[in-house]
Amino acid sequence: MIDPDGFRPNVGIILTNDIGQVLWARRINQDAWQFPQGGIDARESPEEALFRELNEEVGLEPQDVRILACTRGWLRYRLPQRLVRSHSQPLCIGQKQKWFLLRLLSDEQRVRMDLTGKPEFDGWRWVSYWYPLGQVVAFKREVYRRALKELAPRLLARD
């Protein structure tokens, strides 16, 4: 599902532990790290997509987490030209994302990256909240900065 402007609706997931660190996942067979994220299917709400992607990518169920916050609007990034599939219709030029800040309620051993036949990640670790800004691929960096900045007060509220 791609919107009229060429952006694919998507959810981004920032999963935190009790000490405010965030889950940072390594893309399978690559030295590239990112937050879990995934597309929103037709007739699926962002929250429904969040829980589906959370299960597909890190093996967690709704009862394993608590939603702390969500970005107010859509945050967009454009794909580099080399990643745009110019012969696909409709043309997708980037992603528009709703970002969710979650607190892990269950034991971290519940995190599993191998529950689907096509896992996206093969490893993960806890990192400091702002660490991903210096590590994520450049074309996603501004969206990460905006999401982390908007959601940070909710993490610091420590409720």
Swiss-Prot record:
InterPro entries: Nudix_hydrolase (IPR020476), NUDIX_hydrolase-like_dom_sf (IPR015797), NUDIX_hydrolase_CS (IPR020084), NUDIX_hydrolase_dom (IPR000086), RppH (IPR022927). The keyword Metal-binding applies. GO terms for molecular function: metal ion binding; pyrophosphatase activity. Keywords: Hydrolase, Metal-binding. Gene3D superfamilies: Nucleoside Triphosphate Pyrophosphohydrolase. Residues 6-149 form the Nudix hydrolase domain. Its cofactor is a divalent metal cation. SUPFAM superfamilies: Nudix (SSF55811). A motif (Nudix box) lies at residues 38-59. The keyword Acyltransferase does not apply. Its EC number is 3.6.1.-. Accelerates the degradation of transcripts by removing pyrophosphate from the 5'-end of triphosphorylated RNA, leading to a more labile monophosphorylated state that can stimulate subsequent ribonuclease cleavage. Belongs to the Nudix hydrolase family. RppH subfamily. This is RNA pyrophosphohydrolase. It comes from Azotobacter vinelandii (strain DJ / ATCC BAA-1303). The gene is rppH.
